[in-house]
Amino acid sequence: MKNKVVVIPGSFSLVSAYGGYDGIDIWLNKKLDKEKLKGADFIIAHSAGVNYLFTQPILNNQKIILINPLVKKINLISLLIRDVRFFIAEGIDRNKIIPLSSWIFASIKVLRLLKINVLENLRKLPKENVVIIRGTKDYYFCDSENANLIKNEGFILYEVDAGHNWNKNIAEVVNTLIHAN
């Protein structure tokens, strides 16, 4: 039986950037098909997409794969500084981000979602249903301090050769996790 997988992309990213998985383009200013989440066996959420996930109902039988989550709450100034450093270091692939026409909508959504306490919500989930993947070169959002918080809470953490963005190394771990079930 094939697992149904749904992706919730990171800030300003499109689902199409995630290797062909189905998903919800939460950063576009359009109606969302939230029903996709209810029927998913696996939910992959990346970065601020994790914050969005925690605004939705999660079923006890769903497997959750979190990629570079923003575990530790940060203030707006810190976020902006990290954003600038991130964009300088990792760049922007224009084919993977939302159109400029959705940027104001996405910016407002990010600010709202940053109020979500990711760590508090993680604690509510069954640990056996959650896997977290961190890029070891993510110095901006899911840094070593966030990794230590994740480990101290007892969650499974895979650390791979990646930055903050989805890449082939993250994709390989995700693929292995999905096909192992």
Positions of predicted regions on the chain:
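Hydrophobic/aromatic beta-strand patches that form the interior of the parallel beta-sheet core
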Residues: 6, 22-24, 65, 131-133, ...
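Aromatic pocket-lining residues of Rossmann-like dinucleotide-binding sites
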Residues: 56-59
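Residue in the alpha/beta-hydrolase core beta-strand immediately N-terminal to the catalytic nucleophile
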Residues: 41-44, 63-65
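Short, surface-exposed "cap/lid" segments of acyl-processing enzymes
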Residues: 1-32
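Gly/Ala-rich beta-loop-alpha elbow adjacent to hydrolase catalytic centers
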Residues: 44-53
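The conserved beta1-alpha1 loop
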Residues: 6-10, 46, 134-135
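The alpha/beta-hydrolase serine catalytic core
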Residues: 69-141, 147, 153-170
